[in-house]
Amino acid sequence: MIRDAKFFWGVGAICLLAFIAIAILTDQIFEHVPHSEDEVAYVFQAKVFAQYRLAVPTPLNDQAFWTPFVVDFNGLRFGKYAPGWPLLLSLGIRLNAPWLVNALLGTLTLALIA
């Protein structure tokens, strides 16, 4: 199937609108805050990865800093989930815009589907 320039401009416009919609929803509805315990663990691990580390030392009073789905083991604290998503999210953390990762991935997915 041969696609003309109008098609690609249309896809580009839809992707741009999707990116803007995701950015507005992230800002106005979700307020750039993780809303589930899973998300908190992902953001924690992404912040650790953004420091070029795999784990951080456990705080002295670890019970006061308990976080669901974050593991304290042998004096180290790390997320319990696979590192793929936190590693991608760490790129956004380094840019001080973690919301950008979801917006770009959503837009890329939309473009690939078209």
Where are these regions (language model features)?
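Helix-to-loop transition at the C-terminal end of transmembrane segments
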Residues: 23-40, 53-60
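Solvent-exposed loop and edge beta-strand segments that line ligand/cofactor-binding
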Residues: 12, 74-78, 97, 101
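Residue-level signature of the transmembrane alpha-helical core
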Residues: 16, 87, 91, 100-104
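Start-transfer (signal-anchor) and selected internal transmembrane alpha helices
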Residues: 1-25
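Hydrophobic (often cysteine-bearing) scaffold residues that line and stabilize catalytic clefts
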Residues: 38, 80, 84, 109, ...
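Transmembrane-helix motifs of polytopic, lipid-linked glycan transferases
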Residues: 99-114
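Carboxylate/His-rich catalytic cores and anion/metal-binding grooves
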Residues: 45-51
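Interfacial juxtamembrane loops and adjacent helix segments
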Residues: 51-92
